[in-house]
């Protein structure tokens, strides 16, 4: 049986809802989402403060949607999902070079949504999210 999940990408009032049919658990979809976001950071430039906090939201979304067999845009939650991932960002625009620059506010993983049985957890950084994935990986060994 597949482990289905939804992903919400929030930036202000804009929400993008994605669906993933298989491997929705932390060491599957969670790790993939972590990797795609970490590979969507802004290039390091001397005038940026805290560069690791800023990401290119367009690049992140594009990485997910290019995976034709993994993610699709949806207009409603899946009926039997076990994981709901919510990536919340705030705008990081300063000038024209920053049109898609955002700062990560939080990543929430809801395993209680519909059919999940694992509770809700909120992470304030990508490294906290990776720690949770690593913990889940160890528990499954």
Placement of each model-derived feature along the sequence:
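Active-site beta-strand-loop-beta-strand hairpin of nuclease catalytic cores
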Residues: 11-15
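Low-complexity intrinsically disordered segments
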Residues: 35-141
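Short, solvent-exposed aromatic-acidic interface loops
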Residues: 17-28, 110-115
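Cysteine protease-like catalytic core of ubiquitin/ubiquitin-like
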Residues: 29-34
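Short beta-strand scaffold segments in enzyme catalytic cores
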Residues: 4-9
């Amino acid at each position: 049986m597949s482990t289905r999940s939804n992903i919400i990408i929030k930036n202000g009032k804009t929400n993008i809802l994605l669906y993933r049919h298989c491997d929705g658990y932390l060491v599957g979809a969670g790790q993939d989402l972590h990797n795609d976001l970490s590979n969507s950071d802004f290039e390091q430039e001397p005038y940026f403060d805290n560069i690791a906090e800023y990401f290119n939201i367009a690049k992140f979304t594009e990485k997910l949607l290019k995976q034709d067999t993994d993610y699709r845009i949806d207009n409603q939650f899946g009926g039997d999902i076990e994981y709901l991932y919510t990536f919340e960002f705030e705008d990081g625009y300063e000038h024209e070079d920053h049109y898609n620059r955002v700062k990560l506010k939080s990543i929430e993983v809801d395993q209680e949504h519909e059919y999940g049985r694992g509770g809700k957890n909120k992470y304030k950084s990508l490294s906290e999210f990776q720690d949770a994935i690593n913990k889940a990986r160890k528990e499954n060994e």
